[in-house]
């Protein structure tokens, strides 16, 4: 009985090894440069060459300054977009994150809206967009 179990275990190991080995892609052995050129489907001369240039400290500072200028111009542009006249606040309104069940008045913040959950049982004023 032990011999048959040992034989079955050995057979199982060989089957596992054969299954794994059969799914591995075969390795191509290239003997020289000529076979590499004949087997490759893409010609390496078609691609442009790449040149590596070392940056000196002055060019690094210039690029940092340019990056800062770009960042500041983007911030200024976004600030210009955000600035818009706000409507005058009316006295009866609901503050942000306070309850605003349907008979309640509108939210005080013009960017906020009344959000209800659980079948309109829990409602609160929330700001949905950060750019507003």
UniProtKB/Swiss-Prot annotation:
Disordered: annotated segments: 61-87
Compositional bias (Basic and acidic residues): 64-79
Location(s), subcellular: Secreted
Signal peptide bounds: 1-22
Cysteine pairings via disulfide bonds: 93-108, 100-114, 107-125, 111-132, 116-123
Functional summary from the UniProt entry: Involved in the regulation of melanogenesis. The binding of ASP to MC1R precludes alpha-MSH initiated signaling and thus blocks production of cAMP, leading to a down-regulation of eumelanogenesis (brown/black pigment) and thus increasing synthesis of pheomelanin (yellow/red pigment).
Record's protein name: Agouti-signaling protein
Organism classification: Eukaryota, Metazoa, Chordata, Craniata, Vertebrata
Gene name of this polypeptide: ASIP
